[in-house]
């Protein structure tokens, strides 16, 4: 009985945020396990099976995912097999955000492609902020509370540790950590083979 009530509670929350959403260019059919607020004049595209929200995980019942393609030319794109954990938010002010297939975002991640305000105090409200497309490669593991800022490119198979603030690009097969992010060590295909136990022979 309790599990059924919780299912309906979350289902109603998902419907509520869908009704609040104003983005008319959402393509694909993601799996909505948590409420998602789709905002903006741009395009939000889901390729294949994309999972939004994770249970059990923090903020599942009291948070929501925020995805905003703010300007008409903004595009936020998710590859097949991407998992986005609870209370993440992504905002594109034009250049765009791309997340490669098989990548995973931890709880409360932030990805933005713009400063949104000019750094000059005289032009803070009407200046042209710096911006740059964010590209996350395939099979990237991004921990919780990570911030990825404008112009960053993260190579495939890399790992971004919890709480990292990524201000510069990260090569593939790399561990990044800290604020601002530092890189090292680099992984190799041989490292992954050593971490995967060999299958036991069948009798």
PLM features: residue spans?
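Domain-scale signature associated with acetyltransferase and cell-envelope carbohydrate enzymes
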Residues: 1-113, 137-138, 156, 172, ...
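Short acidic, glycine/proline-rich loop/turn micro-motifs
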Residues: 62-63, 121-125
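Beta-rich strand-turn-strand
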Residues: 88-96, 144-158, 164-168
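Contiguous, function-dense segments enriched for cysteine-driven chemistry
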Residues: 116
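Glycine-rich NAD(P)-binding loop of Rossmann-like domains
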Residues: 124-136
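A short, glycine- and basic residue-enriched loop/turn
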Residues: 133-134, 151-152, 173
């Amino acid at each position: 009985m309790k599990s059924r009530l919780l299912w309906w509670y979350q289902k109603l929350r998902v419907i509520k945020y869908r009704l609040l959403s104003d983005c008319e260019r959402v393509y694909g059919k993601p799996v909505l396990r948590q409420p998602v607020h789709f905002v903006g004049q741009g395009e939000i595209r889901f390729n294949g099976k994309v999972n939004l929200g994770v249970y059990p995980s923090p903020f599942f019942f009291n948070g929501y995912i925020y995805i905003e393609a703010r300007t008409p030319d903004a595009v936020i794109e998710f590859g097949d097999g991407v998992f986005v954990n609870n209370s993440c938010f992504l905002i594109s002010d034009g250049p765009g955000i791309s997340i490669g297939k098989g990548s995973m975002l931890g709880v409360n991640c932030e990805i933005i492609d713009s400063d949104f305000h000019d750094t000059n105090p005289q032009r803070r409200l009407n200046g042209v902020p710096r911006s740059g497309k964010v590209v996350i490669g395939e099979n990237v593991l991004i921990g919780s509370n990570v911030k990825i800022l404008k112009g960053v490119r993260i190579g495939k198979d890399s790992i971004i540790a919890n709480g990292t603030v990524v201000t510069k690009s990260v090569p593939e097969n790399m561990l990044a950590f800290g604020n601002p992010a530092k890189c090292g060590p680099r992984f190799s295909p041989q490292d992954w083979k050593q971490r995967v136990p060999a299958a036991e022979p069948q009798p």
